[in-house]
Amino acid sequence: ATPARLRHLLTLARDAGVNMLRVSGTATYESDAFYALCDELGILVWQDFMFANFDYPIADDGVRVLVEKEAAQVTGELAHRPSVAVFCGGSEIEQQLAMLGLDPELAQGPLSTELLPGAVAASGSDAAYVTSSPSGGALPFRFGSGVAHYFGVGGYRRPLSDVRLAGVRFASECLALANVPDDDADWDRGVPADAGADWTFADVRDHYLAEHYGVDPAGLRRDDLALARLRRVPARD
């Protein structure tokens, strides 16, 4: 995104009360402009290293050298940023092993417990370090301890009360809900969905819209006035 676009989006986030953004290990490192704007706007950053889901062959000398260079470069560029509050070893690495029925401690090898935290310490950063997101507790995906990925209100369509009743201590990943789109036969072609799931994230949004507001999302798409009232914007002519 351009600096102007970044400023627009991050200002919207700040004005909405967002106080932390996570750069996930499934993505890519952000631009200098992103971190500078987070510094300026007072938005904290949870920064994953770009590792996710896999068992990385860190014992291989060639791989280790590349990872050491990457970690040193990333921490060297971000250690001075007041917005960077957390460095994390990656996304769902410990969870992946646990979901396969393996001991999640097998994922706590030299990559996440030695090399990456060592790079953070060597950079002089005082940011917290977390081995993986999620992590903590007997199983990394349990909510009662450590860092959680919570989708109870979301993909699992739990009632809204579950947000409080599930006992989530800290959610570094959860499902946000979008507004209802216009009625367009092609609108849902790009709607994301988990592989193998029989629902899309639009279905999740519609479920909670109906539950919380008592309205029919499909009907809203055909009623411009009702849709405008829900969005709190003037209806189009």
Predicted features and spans:
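Short, solvent-exposed loop/turn and secondary-structure capping segments
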Residues: 33-34, 98-99, 181-183
